[in-house]
């Protein structure tokens, strides 16, 4: 497949790009700063005309959108959050209407507040924060494109990345873990594999991409400690 990964320098984007390249796909990446591991286009999604040119100029089979602004940064920058998390996914989908190109949009399980559950694809999206709501608005639901809702863990090439694994690897001494906070997410590698399979099977609509069993964040941190810190 001819694949374009938008936001290739993020925690998800870099793993997805490398996975698809290693599987033999023709991968082009789009990022604000250089991504040296694949063919790379440097640009900014806020430059709308250039961004649309990147999407339209090559007849890609698959575009994976990993662009977004996260958590407290979304709350602190509401206009940027609406543009990147809500508007850009629909702009891409609208632009691709007359192309065969499929869009896979990355959403989040944060569209649900987590106060009830279990949550299904058609459950009411009751996320409370500005980030939660902008991501909910950015979900694409049609019979061509695909939205994956998920929570992810994995390595980050950005030393300032805010992911749980990156945070854990920078900690020293005793740290706290939540025994009642359940996590049902997947690794970024599993996400990349799921995206490849979904594209091959032409999956469309919205799917909650979750693990087949949950784990507390405390137990997840214990696994990190066992396999990456040798039970320090």
Each language-model region and where it sits:
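NAD(P)H-binding glycine-rich loop region in Rossmannoid oxidoreductase-like domains
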Residues: 45-84
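NAD(P)-dependent short-chain dehydrogenase/reductase
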Residues: 128-130, 140-190, 196
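Rossmann-fold cofactor-recognition segment
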Residues: 32-48
């Amino acid at each position: 497949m001819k694949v374009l990964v938008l936001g290739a320098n993020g925690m998800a984007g870099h793993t997805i790009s490398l996975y698809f390249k290693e599987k033999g796909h023709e991968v082009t990446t789009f990022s604000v700063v250089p991504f040296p591991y694949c063919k790379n286009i440097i640009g900014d999604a806020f430059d709308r005309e250039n961004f649309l040119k990147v999407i339209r100029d090559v007849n890609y089979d698959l575009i994976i959108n990993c662009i977004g602004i996260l958590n407290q940064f979304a709350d602190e920058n509401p206009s940027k959050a609406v543009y990147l998390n809500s508007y850009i996914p629909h702009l891409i989908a609208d632009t691709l209407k007359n192309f065969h190109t499929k869009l896979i949009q990355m959403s989040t399980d944060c569209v649900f507040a987590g106060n009830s559950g279990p949550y299904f694809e058609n459950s009411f999206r009751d996320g409370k924060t500005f980030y939660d709501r902008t991501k909910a608005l950015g979900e694409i639901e049609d019979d061509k494109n695909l939205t994956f809702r998920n929570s992810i863990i994995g390595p980050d090439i950005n030393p300032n990345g805010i992911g749980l694994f990156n945070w854990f690897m920078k900690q020293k001494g005793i740290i706290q873990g939540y025994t009642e906070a359940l996590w049902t997410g997947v690794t970024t590698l599993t996400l990349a594999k799921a995206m490849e399979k979904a594209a091959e099977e032409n999956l469309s609509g919205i799917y909650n991409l979750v693990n087949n069993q949950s784990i507390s964040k405390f137990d997840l941190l214990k696994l990190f400690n066992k396999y990456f810190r040798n039970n320090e």
